[in-house]
Amino acid sequence: QNAYEIRAEKKKEGLTGFGESTCVLKNFPDKGKVTVTEQVVETLLYEENMPKFSWKLTNKDTTILGYKCFEATTTYRGRTWRAFYTPDIPISEGPWKLCGLPGLILFAADSLNQFCYEGVGMTNDVKHPIALKTKKCRKCNAKEMANMLSLLSKDLDEFFYRLTGAKPQHFDASGKPTKLDASFTACLKEEFDK
């Protein structure tokens, strides 16, 4: 299965598209830092130190985009990740926060296949400096962002109240007050209660 097939399956299961509005900037604003933003009504932002991964290298290999890649596994914030990296591109980076292998990560997935990243092409055509898309952000930490995204799937009124300070009111067709029901399951990359 490729990333698109896995994503389509997850959408059928009712899992949200969290992460589609996530931006991860490594070594930004300073070396050794990671900045993460998530666009939900307004932009949430947190900065933290770059994670240090303890990768276990295996003997498994495959070919991705014409590059011979080798497998490695690690655990980070409640998830076990499997990655394939290529030493032919000696850049110790990868998708999302994943990094620290002796080559570029061209494929990564968590053990439940809820999150999957697969290289589909490469270009060396960078014309714009790396920067935040918006300067107006609500600062938080990683756990607070995860809690807000989880709340978004459970209690929309409370989510909007915490975000805006205003209690939304909802009415049915006859004018009677009603409550919005969240109708999806939050699927977060980072788990803090495990």
What are these model-predicted stretches?
Residues 1-194:
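Extended soluble regions of mature proteins
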